Amino acid sequence: MVLTLLRLHYARGERKALLGNAQLCLKRGGDEREDRETNISCESALILLSLAIDVKNDIVMTAIVGILNKQAVAVAADSAVTVGGGTKIYNTANKIFNLSKGCPVGIAIYGNAALNSCVPWEVVIKMYRKHIGSNKFATLSEYMDDFFNYVRNYTKKYISDEDALNVLKRNLLHFWCVEITQGLRESDDPQSPIAKPALPILLDKLTKLGARLKKEKILSEYKDVTPEDFVKAIEEVLEIIKNQISANGGKWKDEFEAVVEDCLYRLSVTNNPFSRSSVSGVAIFGYGEDEIYPSLHEQQVYNMVLGRLRISPIPDNNTINETNGASICPMAQRDVIETFIEGVSNKIKNTFLDATATAIKKTVNDLSAVTRPHNPALADAIKGMDYSSIIDQYRVQINSIIRRDQVVPLIQTIVSMGKEDIADLAENLIYMTSMKRHVTPYAETVGGPIDVAIISKGDGFIWEKRKHYFSPELNRTFFDTQQ
């Protein structure tokens, strides 16, 4: 009965009711472990939580591009957001904002649309805008530091430890069901036990994953997160995994417990695809008070692990100065824009280079085989040749040609373009990405109206194109208060 009720809440998208009943199941499960039906309800509750689609949290935002020269910085963004892994797409998202009223500084958001998958970034940004008031900073880096200090304090004030921990549990369970045990369970149902013949395969998979993760350094933000504290915090998740493994005779204590705990711990505290799966990208662009040229800086904000928020800078060359007169900075879905910049897609380029390496390897092996009957020593020498340096040299040469013939001429042209021209270029790069998605047999994850903002030293933050969710003619008071 409880399980049916949970599924009904899940199907209707009733998150609040789902959470309430799930937590009740977890409490019952903690008190009555010997009751098999209660354990199933406990298990189902957490799995449903891990797979449930929450339109406020699981929103992924897509294409943004920034173009800079000595006159201005222009940033364009589409309006598409993808919900629940691509099951639903809306074309109404705002991704570009003025960070500080009256100051030439903007901010753009891509990736996860919510801080720690809890609070929409738009809410955080607009609260920061009130917080900063009329304060100004000498450099853009100082604006960025002040904003992220505010974000850290914001998470402590507005995101409870319980909510943050629920997000971590949900993500871990989702990763377990989709990436680890997919194809190893008795059925496609994520609640089903691990099939008995698949238990050795699962153990081998976990052992190899653990070995890879041990090579990764524990990130500095999580140095004080001990394995013991982590395991205690996610004990409900481990109970679910234990039940799945033990149902068909898996030896939890003897074989699986240590390796599962170690894998989940290291997945959460190292830099890997799991920890990057819910990342928000934040780009801050414009001018500090003492700067005459614009810049654009990106940071990645990760979900919290036991109360610790990780914010990581992305190395860039998007600061305009006397030696760097222009820059194009694609963010999120970069493939179409990078093809425009380089004249060839990275996918095609890498495929071509891989095919060349395969052809060289085959030629070496064929030459060795032909030589062997006549001169075995020479054949061995040929087969033992290290031709990786040839491939590396070839790769460097290809990249050099692309830069000389494609990238440099484009950047040199952008150096002398006016504000309106770089704004038009930014808009068209987003439009090209949208059109590419439109004519391919995949979800249209880039689309909708394109917003374009220009920031110059003299004029400050200017909207060239901006959508509204309301009619400006009917809401004059809104614009009056903005003044």
Which residues does each predicted region cover?
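Short, positively charged and aromatic/hydrophobic N-terminal segments
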Residues: 9, 27, 46-57
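Short hydrophobic alpha-helical segments enriched in small aliphatic residues
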Residues: 11, 22, 32, 43-45, ...
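Intrinsically disordered, glycine-rich low-complexity segments
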Residues: 12-15, 28-37
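Compositionally biased, low-complexity segments
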Residues: 37-40, 46
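N-terminal nucleophile
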Residues: 56-483
